[in-house]
Amino acid sequence: MVGKGGYRQINKALNICAFEDYLDGQQKSLPPLNDVEQISPNVLRVLGQNPGKFTLQGTNTYIIGTGEKRLLIDTGQGIPEWADLISSTLANSSIRLSAVLLSHWHGDHTGGVPDLLRLYPHLSDSIYKHSPSKGQQPIEDGQVFEVEGATVRAVHAPGHSHDHMCFVIEEENAMFTGDNVLGHGTAAVELLSTWMATLRLMQSHNCGRGYPAHGEVIPNLNAKISGELASKERRERQVLQHLNRIRKEEQGGKGSATVQRLVVEMYGDTDQQMREQALEPFIDEVLRKLAEDEKVAFQLRAGEKTWFAIALE
């Protein structure tokens, strides 16, 4: 398997777009999205044809600009139907891609690159990504890409992944949020503390709308981000409350709990795949952040981490 930045991560979608809140998000039905839709005068959305429990309606790929030459953000998962859809969409509108901007390395965003290069060899030197792989060009924070009708500014926004980029289209004061902020539910993250700091950075751009990598358009991006931050802070409090109760009630005031136990107590009986691929990694990340804040710690018991509250509240 190719490492970070590679294109053979196609089947690694299980922990890259998962809902954090299973009960509040996963059980809701998702609104249908059109395969191809002009969502603004400057932005055309093309679905990646990879719908699923974790990818929602599929990966959103975006054709940006109003002239013959345009930009493309993300390439989907490598589904042949997406390549056909992109090809017909570009041909029908006499569009020529001048550059491809990848939001991050995950396979449901980079998987379509080989198809693009097969269809459009002129793009071989025009695939851009932060921390680029061989043959790719770098994207730096603040870098600007321009085509007719679109001035797109890159924003380094780690959290969901180390190399994650968002993009601001200045003509609309809108932001392509990648997987940091989704149209429905909440994305999984690599490092919670970094992601939360990044959300505040994203808010500082004061963009109106958000164009996420999964889900429908976000009409009020800053309000959505505020909700995300509040949700994570609430989860931190809940985890700490559970650990405080366990410490008080068990083992003579020295009680502790594994991640698996905390997930069961907080979320109840959930789907095993969702539990193992989304909820347990998320709670583990919450615990790591609480440890950074010196509110919890862990000990090893039979080779397994058990977490406890440092100071009872």
UniProtKB/Swiss-Prot annotation:
E.C. number: 3.1.2.-
Catalyzed reactions per annotation: atrochrysone carboxyl-[ACP] + H2O = atrochrysone carboxylate + holo-[ACP] + H(+)
Keyword Acyltransferase among record annotations: no
Database matches in Pfam families: Lactamase_B
Residues given in the record as Zn(2+) 1 binding sites: H104, H106
Active site, per annotation: D108
Annotated residues for binding of Zn(2+) 2: D108, H109
GO MF terms, alphabetically ordered: hydrolase activity; metal ion binding
A Gene Ontology biological process term: secondary metabolite biosynthetic process
Cofactor: Zn(2+)
Xref: SMART domains: Lactamase_B
Binding note for cofactor: Binds 2 Zn(2+) ions per subunit.
Catalytic EC class: hydrolase
Induction line: The cluster is expressed in rice fermentation medium. Three regulators are located in the cluster (ptaR1, ptaR2 and ptaR3), suggesting that the production of pestheic acid is controlled by a complex regulatory mechanism.
InterPro entries hit by this protein: LACTB2-like_MBL-fold, Metallo-B-lactamas, RibonucZ/Hydroxyglut_hydro, Sec-metab_biosynth-thioest, WH-like_DNA-bd_sf
Annotated keywords: Hydrolase, Metal-binding, Zinc
Domain of life, per lineage: Eukaryota
General function of this protein: Lactamase-like protein; part of the gene cluster that mediates the biosynthesis of pestheic acid, a diphenyl ether which is a biosynthetic precursor of the unique chloropupukeananes. The biosynthesis initiates from condensation of acetate and malonate units catalyzed by the non-reducing PKS ptaA. As the ptaA protein is TE/CLC domain-deficient, hydrolysis and Claisen cyclization of the polyketide could be catalyzed by ptaB containing a beta-lactamase domain.
Family: Belongs to the metallo-beta-lactamase superfamily.
Protein's recorded name: Lactamase-like protein ptaB
Organism (species): Pestalotiopsis fici (strain W106-1 / CGMCC3.15140)
Species lineage: Eukaryota, Fungi, Dikarya, Ascomycota, Pezizomycotina
Gene: ptaB
